[in-house]
Design a protein with these regions (language model features):
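Glycine-rich portal/gate segments that line the openings of hydrophobic small-molecule binding cavities
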Residues: 40-93
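Hydrophobic/aromatic beta-strand elements that line small-molecule binding cavities or substrate pockets
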Residues: 9-11, 69-75, 99-107
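C-terminal helix/juxtamembrane-tail motif
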Residues: 2-4, 106, 132-152
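Hydrophobic pocket/interface hotspot
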Residues: 20-24, 31, 56, 73, ...
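Beta-strand/loop substructures that line and gate deep hydrophobic ligand-binding cavities in soluble
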Residues: 84-140
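Intrinsically disordered, low-complexity basic segments at termini and long loops, enriched
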Residues: 10-14, 87, 139, 147
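A generic structural micro-feature
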Residues: 1-3, 48-50, 63-67, 93-97, ...
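Hydrophobic ligand-binding cavity/cleft-lining segments
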Residues: 1-51
């Protein structure tokens, strides 16, 4: 059984790609007020939510249970509308040595977009399940962000 793996989910949204991506690079702190499964988010290190290497604390609901973790942005590629995040510490570190996710938004010809979330992980041992619950978390969260942006 492999310890490393990759999972991804693609979510079709009605919001234009640039507007959808923009909330993640300029208003990331608002996600806790938009997404039902984000209970809390706050700065741990740094003073800007939207720059690489600033560290945030998050409490999320994944698989029906609250989990705590830290997150930092590793890279932002505005041209390709992608952000690479590293999730670590807290409950993540209990099961995974490595837990990164790539968020990317693709334009669609109808004016909407596709939001893609890809997790790359390494489990601490083979008894740990792949992080399938995060796929549901990202799917639901992406739709909540879309709904919020369509009303804005």
């Amino acid at each position: 059984m492999a310890l490393s793996g990759k999972l991804s989910v693609e979510v079709t949204v009605q919001t234009p790609a640039a507007k959808y991506f923009n909330i993640f690079i300029t208003q990331f702190h608002k996600l806790q007020n938009i997404c039902e499964r984000i209970l809390e988010g706050n700065m741990h290190e740094g003073d800007n939510w939207h720059v690489p290497h600033s560290v945030k604390n998050w409490t999320l609901i994944v698989d029906g249970k609250p989990i705590k973790l830290k997150e930092k942005i590793e890279a932002i590629d505005k041209e390709n509308k992608s952000i690479t995040y590293n999730l670590f510490d807290g409950d993540i570190s209990k099961n995974y040595k490595v837990f990164k996710f790539l968020f990317q938004v693709f334009e669609k010809s109808d004016g909407g977009a596709t939001a893609k979330f890809t997790i790359e992980y390494e489990k601490i041992n083979e008894n740990v399940e792949a992080p399938y619950g995060f796929m549901e978390f990202f799917d639901k969260g992406a739709k909540e962000v879309d709904s919020y942006l369509l009303k804005a």
